[in-house]
């Protein structure tokens, strides 16, 4: 009898050791369709010193491409251990998965860390989401495989989960803050932007971005405020050296991404990003507003400056099991090398509805429109739609 009791206790020890481990994640996939439209306006040519009067306008439109896609499924494990005197060890391991096949081949390619938490706050090291990623949860609630058009992809381009160390303070009267440090050797701030090439039949081929040598240490900071249904967030990024290309928008493969300028990169200096987000939640109503400023200097002798200014808004309201929502984003004409780019703005609208079959399973439907102006008379437009299913566990 005593041997049986001892065996029972010993067999229960491993279960007790993992009792604080939580398994969670989301499985989401569906059908997506999209097409791309473009217009190129060529000004009259000058012949023998005389300028012609004929403007050439070329329009192109791709066929609708439809495919079954994973919408960002992932699986995660997290847990904690009480170390006594109010101190806890915390850890998390997240991994992208795909119900459409393929996907990442390395574990921990999403937010994964280990750290300590206590009255002093929380300190974590590993792949930790930055403050921009935190703020985007309110402004960009969309699920899709197409993060350019069917999500606010341009606006949220600074969202990241860098290998870093991050400290989050406890809350004081509704306020909390955070700081984050990415060492140069872990920085992804140096790379050659992705771009398209054309063959003789004008078929586009994507050449993916190439990660290069680290640019420099990267610093993040954030300030949060919450009071009842109101919430606010300020996110900041700074890198002394960052090789992010001539135009941040080129990273999203639209507009002039086929130009020779887009294929090269200029080392940027003093790259900083500021984002301010505000939200209100009451009953079934959710509102979010955000503004973002992206500043940098070029590595040339003149130290010319670049800047982009953008705004975004999202609104949703719950009617029973249905949650319709709409998002809008606008990027103003950018400033590149100290000069304003005429007609270089962009506009984006996403509208859709989630229908909850239960607390964990929902149908998701959305339609999106994105137009990026690339000069006077020139633009690239993406139209997209998706319908899918999401299950949380």
Curated annotation (Swiss-Prot):
Keywords: Cell outer membrane, Ion transport, Membrane, Porin, Signal, Transmembrane, Transmembrane beta strand, Transport. Homotrimer. InterPro entries: Gram-neg_bact_OMP, Gram_neg_porin_domain, Porin_dom_sf, Porin_Gram-ve, Porin_Gram-ve_CS, Porin_Neis. Its main location: membrane. It is found in: Cell outer membrane. Gene3D superfamilies: Porin. The keyword Signal applies. It comes from the Bacteria. It is a multi-pass membrane protein. This is Major outer membrane protein P.IA. GO terms for molecular function: porin activity. One of its GO terms (cellular component) is cell outer membrane. GO terms for biological process: monoatomic ion transmembrane transport. Belongs to the Gram-negative porin family. Residues 1-19 form the signal peptide. Serves as a slightly cation selective porin. Major antigen on the gonococcal cell surface and it may have pathogenic properties in addition to its porin activity. CDD domains: gram_neg_porins. The lineage of its organism: Bacteria, Pseudomonadati, Pseudomonadota, Betaproteobacteria, Neisseriales.
């Amino acid at each position: 009898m005593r041997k049986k009791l001892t065996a029972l206790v010993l067999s229960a020890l491993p279960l007790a050791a993992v009792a604080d481990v939580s398994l969670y994640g989301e499985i989401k996939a569906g059908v997506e369709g999209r097409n791309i439209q473009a217009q190129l306006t060529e000004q009259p040519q000058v012949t023998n010193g005389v300028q012609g009067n004929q403007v050439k306008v070329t329009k192109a439109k791709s066929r609708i491409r439809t495919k079954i896609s994973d919408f960002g499924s992932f699986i995660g494990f997290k847990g904690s251990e009480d170390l006594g005197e109010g101190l806890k060890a915390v850890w998390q391991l997240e991994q992208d998965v795909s119900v459409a096949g393929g996907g990442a081949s390395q574990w921990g390619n999403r937010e994964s860390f280990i750290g300590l938490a206590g009255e002093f706050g929380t300190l974590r090291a590993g792949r930790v989401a930055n403050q921009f990623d935190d703020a985007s949860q309110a402004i960009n609630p969309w699920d899709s495989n197409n993060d350019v058009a069917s999500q606010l992809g341009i606006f949220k381009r600074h969202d990241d989960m860098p290998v870093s160390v991050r400290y989050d303070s406890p809350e004081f009267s509704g306020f909390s803050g955070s700081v984050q440090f990415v060492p140069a050797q872990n920085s992804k701030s140096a790379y050659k932007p992705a771009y398209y090439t054309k063959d003789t039949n004008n078929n586009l081929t994507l050449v993916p971005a190439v990660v290069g040598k680290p640019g420099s240490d990267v610093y993040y900071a954030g300030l949060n405020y919450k009071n009842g249904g109101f919430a606010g967030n300020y996110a900041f990024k700074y890198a002394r050296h960052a090789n992010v290309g001539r135009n941040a928008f080129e990273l999203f493969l639209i507009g002039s991404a086929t130009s020779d300028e887009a294929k090269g990169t200029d080392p940027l200096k003093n790259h900083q990003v500021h984002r301010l987000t505000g939200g209100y939640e009451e009953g079934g109503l959710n509102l979010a507003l955000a503004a973002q400023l992206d500043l940098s200097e070029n590595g040339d002798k003149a130290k010319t400056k670049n800047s982009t200014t953008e705004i975004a808004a999202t609104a949703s309201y719950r009617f029973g099991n249905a949650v319709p929502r709409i998002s809008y984003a606008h990027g103003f004409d950018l400033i590149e090398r100290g000069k304003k780019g005429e007609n270089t703005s962009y506009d984006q609208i996403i509208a859709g509805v989630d229908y909850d079959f239960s607390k964990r399973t929902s149908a998701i439907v959305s339609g999106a429109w994105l137009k990026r102006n690339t000069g006077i008379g020139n633009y690239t437009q993406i139209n997209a739609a998706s319908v899918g299913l999401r299950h949380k566990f």
